[in-house]
């Protein structure tokens, strides 16, 4: 059994659907992975059915799903050294909330050669009624044809080149020209 160590909530006033609270949780499962090793892992009992039944606004708002992800960060002395910063949280972007600025602090850029940034966004949509750009330090990111400059979270997956990653979006962008050695923060604007 794994319990959340951190929980992130976003309250959204969905007009006629009332206030909806979205959440994301985080747990460090490093020890479990080390103890179990290379094997098949199963996730079970992620049940949000009672939340959907008791709050019909989620279904009416077409945001009735749950998901999970596992980030694996490992060390291999045969590979080049990489600097990794992992940030977690939850924000909402939609037709009413079209812009967010996120400041990532406590970054110490040692090298920007081949630097990348990745995003996992839930509820990625290909067809939007407004633009959805993503910028790092004032520079709009894109990696066409998968991620155009005006639809960053479009239900795609950079790793598999999938264009039908329904209800999610997993993308990695090269940002070596958007950060500099010695930078201690990054400004993300969505």
Predicted regions and their residues:
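A short beta-strand element within beta-rich, extracytoplasmic domains
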Residues: 1, 111-124
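Cysteine-clustered segments with highest specificity for TGF-beta superfamily mature ligands
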Residues: 2-61, 138-190
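A surface/extracellular/periplasmic glyco- and lipid-processing/surface-interacting theme
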Residues: 17-116
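Short, flexible beta-strand-to-coil junctions
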Residues: 47, 76, 121-127
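Short coil-to-beta strand junction motifs in C2/discoidin
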Residues: 63-66, 126-134
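Composition- and surface-driven signal marking solvent-exposed, interaction-prone regions
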Residues: 85-86, 129-135, 145-147
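Active-site proximal loops enriched in glycine and acidic residues that flank catalytic Cys/His/Asp
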Residues: 88, 119-123, 190
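Active-site lining segments that contact anionic ligands and/or coordinate catalytic metals
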Residues: 112-117, 131, 183-185
């Amino acid at each position: 059994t794994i319990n959340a160590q951190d929980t992130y909530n976003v309250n959204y006033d969905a007009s006629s659907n009332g206030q909806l609270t979205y959440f994301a949780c985080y747990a460090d499962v490093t020890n479990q992975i080390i103890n179990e090793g290379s094997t098949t892992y199963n996730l079970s009992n992620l049940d949000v059915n009672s939340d959907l039944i008791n709050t019909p606004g989620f279904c009416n708002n077409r945001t009735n799903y749950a998901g999970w992800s596992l980030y694996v960060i490992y060390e291999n002395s045969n590979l080049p050294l990489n600097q990794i910063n992992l940030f977690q949280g939850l924000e909402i972007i939609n037709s009413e909330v079209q812009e967010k600025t996120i400041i990532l602090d406590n970054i110490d850029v040692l090298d920007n050669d081949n630097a990348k940034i990745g995003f996992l966004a839930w509820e990625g949509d290909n067809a939007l009624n407004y633009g959805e750009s993503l910028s790092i330090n004032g520079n709009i990111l894109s990696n066409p044809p998968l991620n155009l400059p005006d639809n960053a979270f479009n239900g795609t997956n950079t790793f598999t080149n999938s264009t039908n990653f329904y209800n999610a979006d997993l993308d990695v962008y090269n940002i070596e020209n958007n950060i500099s050695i010695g930078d201690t923060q990054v400004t993300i604007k969505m």
